[in-house]
Amino acid sequence: KVAEGDFDAAYEIITSTNSLPAVCGRVCPQEKQCESKCVRGIKGESVGIGRLERFVADYHMNKEVKDEIKVPESNGHRIAIVGSGPASLTCAGDLRKMGYDVTIFEAFHKSGGVLVYGIPQFRLPKEIVAAEIDNLKAMGVKIINNAIIGKSETVDELFEDGFEAVFIGSGAGLPQFLHIPGENLLGVYSANELLTRVNLMKAYRDDYDTPIKHFHNVCVVGAGNVAMDAARVSKRLGAEHVYIAYRRGKDELPARKEEVEHAEAEGIEFRLLNNPVAIHAGEDGHVTGIELQKQELGEPDEKGRRK
């Protein structure tokens, strides 16, 4: 339909199975998922599914007059969803398309979960997330913010209120630490905390109650997409040198190729085949350096990645 120029029909086809096309078109690893299975890739480049999806979603978003969103009449069954991240929003959209009455309970004051507090503005503009959520609301999905299920209300109370099923989409909120000396020093942040404070709470502002300190040298441990986000955010916060320390080589980087290229273009320095063993501090308890141990690649593990 895109090739035919019928972008409205293309949008209808995409949204029949995907409630977040503008988001997925920007941040999903299509090269490892749908595009990797494209038969056109056998003799050349795969169809740019992600970019086409993004184009169609943006075309629809920028239309002055939008078609009314078609949803079936309510079937009378109520579903509660805990959390408003991508899994919850997708679940809400799919259930609403099947006729269920859906209510999302979100602990934060803004909806979107990791799409809002985890992924930086330069990679996923917040107005894009807001527009996708507005589409769900137009379909009849209800969202209640500042509601912590387990404290504001329990799951049992949701059932007592008439909900027939509960989807738990609370996310993987706890960071994974390295368990090395110095993790509790001043100046050590989990990527989760850094990105949440910067993206959602605007802690880069000087008038913020507990502002993020501006550092000259930053080392990010790990090399997934979240690590790339943390490194690029640190650069934007004014860090002169930002390093990524990763225990494997470049071929083993878990981040999307596109994200690695962006990081390199922005001056992020990679310290590959280096594993952190300790974090050091001065007399004031503030970080002064990180100790790395040089690594060598071994045999592939059960997933095919070299150890």
List PLM regions with ranges:
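N-terminal Rossmann-like FAD-binding beta1-loop-alpha1 element of flavoenzymes
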Residues: 77-103, 227-235
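Glycine-rich FAD pyrophosphate-binding loop
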Residues: 100-116, 243-251
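Short glycine-enriched, charge-decorated loop/helix-capping segments at active-site entrances
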Residues: 118-123
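A Rossmann-like FAD-binding core segment of flavoenzymes
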Residues: 127-177, 193, 199-209, 214, ...
